[in-house]
Amino acid sequence: MPIKVLSSLDVARTQWYHFKAIIVAGMGLFTDAYDLFCIAPVMKMISHVYYNGDSINTAVLSTSYAIALLGTATGQLVFGYLGDRVGRRRVYGLCLIIMILSSFGCGFSVCTTRRSCVMVSLGFFRFFLGLGIGGDYPLSATIMSEFANKRTRGAFIAAVFSMQGLGILVSSAVTMAVCVAFKRSGGGLEVDAAAPTEADLAWRLILMIGALPAALTFYWRMLMPETARYTALVENNIVQAAKDMQRVMSRSHISDEATTDPPPPPPPPSYKLFSRCFFRLHGRDLFAASFNWFLVDIVFYTSNLLLSHIFSHYSKKPSTAENVYDAAFEVAELGAIIAACSTIPGYWFTVYFIDKIGRVKIQIMGFFFMAVIYLVAGIPYSWYWSKHEHNNKGFMVLYGLVFFFCNFGPNTTTFIIPAEHFPARFRSTCHGISGAAGKLGAIVGTVGFLWATKKMESDDKNQIYPEVNRMRIAFLILGGVCIAGILVTYFFTKETMGRSLEENEHDQDNNAESEDEPQIVDGQSSVSTLLQTR
């Protein structure tokens, strides 16, 4: 009986509720991207306000970037686990509340000692901001995968993730608008060491605006019912699952497919998380999802840091002509160009092709083309690209393709695959583990890049700079990371296109039974039991 109810999800036509779920779930990813990527121009403004235009100390800068990523990794682990323990819906709203409060907290990072105390306060609130952002990752992916039908599930999850591209674009647009407005109001018109006092308000305003999209969707997120798969397979409440599906899918006959008797107590799971049986059944999938996410985030976050330094290196604008607003505007403008020309198209190419050619092929293709681009840019960098200014546009276009193939490739598929591989009672937890591994890769790429490119000058000041040999080495290392991603994907990642979430678990349980494991024979998984009712 339960399998009939869940089959209704897999064969359901695309309805308005699917698009509503994309918007509600995607707005969390929109907020995530806004908050994580607005920090680059904000740190540029802080360097003028609190450091008199000098580069921020490398230790402070790397900590500022890493603290939110560390919070994100923590949130993915904690809220991913809670999503399986107490339900997706109950935890979903809590993540949004944390993001809203932390965004406002970042804007109110004030203290009498100014520089040091403000940075500590900002880091404190950005950790909790990352905590909420991290929780949103596994919950958004899991909720969308469990609501979607199997024909277009990949496109729906990719559409949710594509809201990150819009978040990056809006983050850049808001930053540019704030900079223009404050500059025209009279502050920062001249090039001087001391930034106007209004600039201290400008960067705070940019951070606090990030709370608005989350606040606007909080009401709609609270109206979302629990997913039918969690209710049916984890709570074993088939009647409630049918009622929830009837509410959102406009199918009155769904409730007739469910029994009207009180639901029996849920059967004990045949194996526990991180048990020997779990690793035998799902260890390969968890390794592939986690390691691929780790690799792609090294590339993605390092590429974003390299971006501003590469383009400023090729830019003909004199660096001495920047004031506090121009400095932040230039960084935001660059982010907007990349988002509009490379990042967003990459996301939507994935939305269109993900259910046509599959997750694995797109992931391998993305890693492959990124590896080619990095090697083509890296091998001749010291003797060609760095010495031929007439090719600067060609180099910028080439480097922009990295972001296209990253998003029409592993950056999106690593978000999708963990939401499809694992049983319902472990799905959110395993997605959180995979995402946390990715954020550890982001920390490695971010902190490693900042320290690898640190330069000590005669006046003992630190600054980041595109030194030729180190840039070449960075490109070659990133190319090698992409090649590693190809190998891990090819040998360890399994395709999930066109298959229901239950079919994936059913096949794995059948494999376990064929090996005559007493643990599986004595207690089958809940999905295997449901499938036998056909």
Swiss-Prot record:
Q: Which UniProt keywords apply?
A: Membrane, Phosphate transport, Phosphoprotein, Symport, Transmembrane, Transmembrane helix, Transport
The encoding gene: PHT1-8
Q: Which GO terms describe its molecular function?
A: symporter activity
Q: Which residues cross the membrane?
A: 22-42, 62-82, 91-111, 124-144, 154-174, 200-220, 282-302, 334-354, 362-382, 397-417, 432-452, 473-493
| One GO process term, biological-process aspect | phosphate ion transport
The record's listing under PROSITE patterns reads: MFS, SUGAR_TRANSPORT_2
Q: What is this protein called?
A: Probable inorganic phosphate transporter 1-8
How would you describe this protein's topology in the membrane?
Multi-pass membrane protein
Q: Does the keyword Nucleotide-binding apply?
A: no
> Record's family?
Belongs to the major facilitator superfamily. Phosphate:H(+) symporter (TC 2.A.1.9) family.
Question: Cytoplasmic face: residue ranges?
Answer: 1-21, 83-90, 145-153, 221-281, 355-361, 418-431, 494-534
| Organism for this UniProt entry | Arabidopsis thaliana
Spell out the Polar residues composition-biased ranges.
Answer: 522-534
Localization, per the record, is: Membrane
